Amino acid sequence: MSPDAIRVVVCGDDAVGKSSLITSLIKETIIEPQTNNVLPPITISRNDYIESSQEYLNDQDHHHHHQSSPSTMKNKRKHNNKRERERERESSINNVQPNEISEYIPNITTIIDTSSSDMTNLQKELKRADVIWLVYSDHYTYERISLHWMPLFRSMGVNLPIILCANKSDLFPKSKSNLKSTNSDEFVPLINEFKEIEAGVRCSAKNNYNVVEAFYLCQRAVTHPISPIFDAKEGNLKPGAIKPLKRIFWLSDTDQDGYLNFEELSELHKKCFGIEASKSDYEEIVNLIDQKILPSYNTTIETQTPPQQQHLATSAGTPNGTTTTTSKGISEDGFILLNKIYAESGRHETVWCILRAYHYTNSLSLSDKFLYPRLDVNPHSSVELSPTGYKFFVDLFIKFDKDNDGGLNEDELNTLFRSTPGIPKLWVESNFPSSIVCNEEGYVTLQGWLAQWNLTTFLSYKTTLEYLAYLGFDEGNSTKALKVTKPRKIRQKNGKTYRNAVNDRNVFNCFIVGAPKAGKSSLLESFLHGSYSDIYSPTIQPRLVVKDIELRGGKQCYLILEELGELEPAILENKSRLDQCDVICYAYDSSDPESFQYLVELREKHGHLLDEVPAVFVALKADLDKQQQRCDVQPENYTRDLFLNSPLHVSLAWNSSLHEMFIQLVDAAKTPSSATPGIELEVSVDQDDIKHIIMTGAAIAVVGLVSIWVLNSLRR
C-alpha cells in the first residue's frame, strides 16, 4: 500500500550539504552546487526508484553479512539495552526484503530543496510537505536542531515526521565502532525529546554513503509511520494500535481458545505476507516471545521479567530458564508483545503489513472502502442475503454457541461482537432480541439470528456490509454475501397504477395499521411466539418483528411485520417509506362496532398514496361475537368496491387462521395485481401469463397441424 505522491522537503542550515545530498541521490555522484543556489524540485517515479533500491538492499545484505528469512514476521535481532535498540532503529532498513521494497514506494516522490535564508518559501513548502528531511553536518548545526529548527516547526503548527540526517560523515574517523557510538550519542537524545523525529541516519553525500537509506526512511515515514503505533518515550505500543491488533488476534483465533496455534498463525501469515509460515518460523516467533518474557540465565537482559508477566509467553519455562513450545500457541498478550518488539526495533513495516492486511489506514481506523464497498442498488430493488451470506452467519452462530444449546446468550453475543463497535444501532432501535424468535431462556436462536440479519439487510444493507467487515467476512469483497433483487416494475391498467409481480425475493415488509385495541400488538406477539398477553399496552414507537414462514409448496421466506405506533400518520404520508412496504395489513376488531370506521377514515385521508400498495383486510378477534360495524359501508362491501378479497377472519387462538393470514400477506406482496385497491382481477393479467397463454396456444396449434399431416400421410 502506498500513497500516489509524497513531498519530501529538505531543511537545514546553510552549507550542511542539502543540495549535495539530493544530487548524490539522483546522479550517484556529488555535484558541487553554487553557493546559496537552491535546486529545482526533483520528481522521482516509482519505477525509477525500485531498481536502485533493490540493488542498495542487496548490497547492504552483503556488507552486513545479513541473511533475511523469507518469513517477514521473524526478527532475529536481540536487544540488550535501550542504546542498542536505537542503533537498530537507525539501520533498520537492512531488514527490508528486496522483493518487498516496491510495496513501500509511492508512485511519485517530489524532493524540495530549500534555503534557510528564504523563510517565506521555506514556510510555504513546509505546509505542503509530507515529511521533513532535516540535515546537519557539525556540532553547531546539530545544536540548532533543538534550539532553532524544532521550535520553528512547532511554532508553525507543522506536525510531520522528521528524518534526521548527519551529513559529511566522511569527515569523521573511519572506525566503525566509533561511528556507531557517535550515532547513538547524537540521535537518541533528540529522538527521545521530539516525538516528531522518527529516525536518524549518518550520511556522506561525497561518498554516496547511506543517501539512498535516508531517502528511503523519508518515504517510509509516510508510508509506514511509527508515531501512530509506537510511543518512543514510554517504549510501548500506543493504545490506538493495540486495539486493532487485538481485533486481528481475535479474528485469527478461529477456534476461540485464546491462543494462536501453528495453523492459525500460518493463515495469518499468509493473509499478511502472501506465504504460509513454516513450523520453524512459528517456533522462532514463540522463542522470540519467550526470550523477551522469560529469558534464560545465559541471556543478558536489562531487568528480569516479573513472574506475573510470564503468562505472556506461550511456552513453558524449564528450571534453567530455557523455553519449550506447547500445543496452545501464542496468547493475545504474546501477540501484542511480538508487535511491540517489531516496532521498537525499527521493524514497524511488519506491524503495518499486519494492520493493512486487515484494511487499517494510517489513522488506525478501518478503510471506508472496506467497510462500505460499492454496491449498485436500483431504487426499486431490495437487498437480501446471498447463499454465501447465509453460510457466513450460520457458521458464526455455530462458532460462538459455546455450550451448544442452540441459543446465543448475552455473554456469547458480547464475545461474538467483540471485533465490532457493538450491537448495530439498528438492532437497538428494533428492540433486539424482542424482534425475533428466542428460546424459552430468552437466548437468540439460529432461526432468529438469520431473521435479524435479513431484517437488517432489507432495511439498511450498508449496516450489514459494515458488520460483515467487522466480523471477519473473508470471501473477498463483502458484497458477495448480499444479492440485489430485480427492480420492481410499475404497470398501469385503466388509469390505475400497480406493481408488477416478483419472483426473486425472499424478504417482504408489511405495515399493520388499525384502530387502537384492534389487536395489532397481540398479532405481532403471536407471529413470533404463538402466544400473546391480554394486558393492553399502547404502542408509542414503531415496532418491528421478523420471522421465516413456510409458504404453499414448502418454500420459505421472511416476513417483516411493522406496527407504526404514533408515527403512523407521518409514515403513511412518506412515499419513500411506502415504497419500502410490500403490503399493508388493514386490521380491525370484528367485535368492536367502531373499529372499522378508523380504516375508512385512514384511507380517505391517505388514499392517494395507499392505493398503490397491495392491501389485505383482516378481521381480528374472530373468536368473539361479530358486531355490525357503525359506518356507511360494511367491511365486505367496502373490500368488494375496491376489487379486493373479503376480510380474512382471524383469531389469535386459531393457529391455522393466523398462518393463512401470513401466507395471504406474502401472496399479495408477490403478486400485487391480485391485491391492489381498484385493480380488477380479470383485467390485471400479468404479462408473463399472457406469454404463457400464447405459447401454449401456439404449441397446441402446432401439434394439431402435425397430427393432420401425419393422418393425411397414412391415408395416402
Swiss-Prot record:
Subcellular locations according to the entry: Mitochondrion outer membrane
UniProt EC number: 3.6.5.-
Residues binding GTP 1: 84-91, 113-115, 167-170
Keyword Calcium part of the UniProt annotation: yes
Domain Miro: 3-224, 505-671
Function text: Mitochondrial GTPase involved in mitochondrial trafficking. Probably involved in control of anterograde transport of mitochondria and their subcellular distribution.
Any coiled-coil regions, as ranges: none
Keywords associated with the record: Calcium, GTP-binding, Hydrolase, Membrane, Metal-binding, Mitochondrion, Mitochondrion outer membrane, Nucleotide-binding, Repeat, Transmembrane, Transmembrane helix
Annotated positions binding GTP 2: 514-521, 550-554, 620-623
One Gene Ontology term from the biological process aspect of the record: mitochondrion inheritance
Membrane topology of the entry: Single-pass type IV membrane protein
Ligand binding (Ca(2+) 1): 253, 255, 257, 259, 264
Family stated for the protein in its record: Belongs to the mitochondrial Rho GTPase family.
Binding site for Ca(2+) 2: 401, 403, 405, 412
Bilayer-crossing regions: 693-713
Protein's name according to its UniProt entry: Mitochondrial Rho GTPase 1
Domain of life of the native organism: Eukaryota
Region Disordered, residue ranges: 58-99, 303-327
